[in-house]
Amino acid sequence: MASLKLGSKSEVFHLSGHTWLCKTGLKPDVMIQVVDESFHLHKFPLLSRSGYLETLFSKASETTCVAQLHDIPGGPETFLLVAKFCYGVRIEVTPENAVSLRCAAEYLQMSENYGDANLIYLTESFLNDHVFVNWEDSIKALEKSCEPKVLPLAEELHIVSRCIGSLAMKACAEDNTSFFNWPISLPEGTTTTTIYWNGIQTKATSENWWFNDVSSFLDLPMYKRFIKTVESRGVNAGIIAASVTHYAKRNLPLLGCSRKSGSPSEEGTNYGDDMYYSHEEQRSLLEEIVELLPGKKCVTSTKFLLRLLRTSMVLHASQVTQETLEKRIGMQLDEAALEDLLIPNMKYSGETLYDTDSVQRILDHFMLTFDSSIVEEKQMMGDSHPLKSITKVASLIDGYLAEVASDENLKLSKFQALGALIPEDVRPMDDGIYRAIDIYIKAHPWLTESEREQLCLLMNCQKLSLEACTHAAQNERLPLRVIVQVLFFEQMRLRTSIAGWLFGSEENNDTSGALEGNKNTNANMVMHGMRERVFELEKECMSMKQDLDKLVKTKEGRNFFSKIFGSRSKTKTSPCGKGGEDALVIPETKN
């Protein structure tokens, strides 16, 4: 750390209670009051260095002059250093006191008009030559500039802006190593590698080497100015987002950051070490952080945005803040994880366990960015990313519905509205939505047959896997209409599969006749395997037909079949969720 030693005389100042006495052998003729401390000094050393004190005491007629300097920058501690400088007593100028000394010198008008190498010149030179060129010293100087009594004059003298500019320049430098004369403090977990330049050993650092320092030492107003300056220098938006994220995790307790002791209360959060954060302070900090985050898609992790959203609900942040977060999450919903999407319901009137309304708004924002025509156009150009994104979101929402479905207070309309936002054609399989529907029906046994049928409109029975079909065919909770549709489509699938195997076997027979004799054995083995597969499929089909016959024999089944099949002349097929009154025909299987 840089320092500047001034003066050569030994210590002559002594404190008695709240009074500073200067023991030089001469009777004091000046008393200066600074807050709760008084200084008994002499006119000549002070007036020869300070234009302000010269003007002040020249108007006084008393033998002993009295002055009050309660608003001097830095308070009694800084004025003591100024007084020692005037008497030529040894003092040390450091990055911690340089700013307050510079401001106090300006306040007291200690310019070159009142002696060579006066305090304004010396402190200004020290700041320019030693403090602003060093990262650590600039941080310390800026931290001291934020003191209430120092800040106004520090702003007027452009000390704050120069500190911020110096820090921003170093943060933006491509080569942020010790060549530029500033120590660095890497975030925890960051590794460094050793590199050599002309035989000189240095440490290569990552782009986030400055995150810890600015997050630890700068309050929010100064951090905002710093990050805006860095951003104006063209730094990548991803680095800006990473820095803001680091700052939030370190300074927003309810976000779940480094200070693990303590627990939130209605009034605020106490994290030990006499550190207390009111909900109002945290809410204000969170809202400012959301404004600082770059709006560019995917530069901020979806996980962090969801954590911010959850915290904003706990702190009852402004509606604008929550809407901004929901919109940004919606833009990159395909990057979200299910566990992060399970946001507890923080509303006073909330009955449900999770906030499904917020998730629905997030999904609405995502769907606004999804245009099927654009997807088709990009697919023709060989870009499958849009389709992959919405497929991932469909799987995510199916999983979310399965998690919230067991909540007895979740209304049917809410469940349907959320599930219906996903277009049917983007799901490669409907097993996920079927699982969610089954859980919901199980948790809500009071649903009527009609309501269950409406719920099943969310899935397409033709897109269920073999395992899901087997489960659905034996699921007594499903409406009978849906069970019949599942059986019908599975039977059609088996017939198609059998026909495909038979067609393949005929082709193999034709080909085997043209092959040489030594290949006939292999062809016969293939044919034997095909026949066994066909036999297995026929047995499976027969088993399903028997299950269907059992349903038909019941009274309810007869009434149901007479209702949905009617005349055999109607032969339209209806996937689950479409064509509710169209007839279904299940042809008989000949044994």
From Swiss-Prot:
Phosphotyrosine found at: Y434
Pathway per the UniProt entry: Protein modification; protein ubiquitination
Domain of life the protein comes from: Eukaryota
Domain called BTB: residue spans: 28-95
Domain NPH3, chain residue ranges per copy: 208-493
InterPro entries in the cross-refs: BTB/POZ_dom, NPH3/RPT2-like, NPH3_dom, SKP1/BTB/POZ_sf
Keyword field: Phosphoprotein, Ubl conjugation pathway
Biological processes per GO annotation: protein ubiquitination
Pfam name, any one: NPH3
Assigned protein family: Belongs to the NPH3 family.
Function: May act as a substrate-specific adapter of an E3 ubiquitin-protein ligase complex (CUL3-RBX1-BTB) which mediates the ubiquitination and subsequent proteasomal degradation of target proteins.
Record remark: domains: The BTB/POZ domain mediates the interaction with some component of ubiquitin ligase complexes.
Protein name listed in UniProt: Putative BTB/POZ domain-containing protein At5g13600
Organism: Arabidopsis thaliana
